[in-house]
Regions:
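Positively charged n-region of N-terminal signal peptides that target proteins for export
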Residues: 1-5
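C-terminal motif of bacterial Sec signal peptides marking the signal peptidase cleavage site
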Residues: 15-18
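Post-signal peptide N-terminal segment of mature Sec-exported envelope proteins
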Residues: 28-46
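Short acidic-glycine-tyrosine-enriched beta hairpin
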Residues: 86-103
Length: 124
């Protein structure tokens, strides 16, 4: 009986150590704003997924997470961004870009007077 107990303990440790946590939040493609989609998939292949996200004034992106990605601003505006560090106002300029190793969660709203458009490039 003792070898079986040791095997059960080993199996339990192995299974627990291989568990990956997954966010309960939607990713950027599934997250929308007031029931409306704000991102569309424009490319999805074995190397990358590219999203185009459009935010009219007073539209935003409900709380969601991001995997590592690169972003490029096709059309900028001013955003109120809320995340794990708090809330801030950011003036996002056309042609600006950013990259990160993922975002646990954030939510944004376009508080500017112009439509903003972003490309989000997620490597696979």
């Amino acid at each position: 009986m003792k070898p079986f107990f040791v095997f059960k303990c080993f199996l339990t440790v192995l299974l627990l150590s291989s568990c990956k946590t997954k966010s309960l939040l939607p990713g950027p493609l599934l997250a929308g704003w007031n029931g409306k989609k704000v991102c569309e998939k424009i490319e999805d292949n074995k190397h990358q997924r590219i999203l185009k996200c459009t935010f009219k004034p007073d539209e935003g992106h409900e709380r969601h997470y991001h995997l590592p990605h690169f972003g490029y601003t096709l059309e900028g505006s001013t955003f109120k961004i809320k995340d794990t560090t708090g809330t801030r106002i950011v003036n996002v300029k056309t042609g600006s870009y950013f990259d990160n190793n993922g975002i646990e969660w954030h939510e944004v709203i376009n508080i500017g007077d112009s439509t903003a458009v972003f490309l989000i490039i997620e490597p696979k």
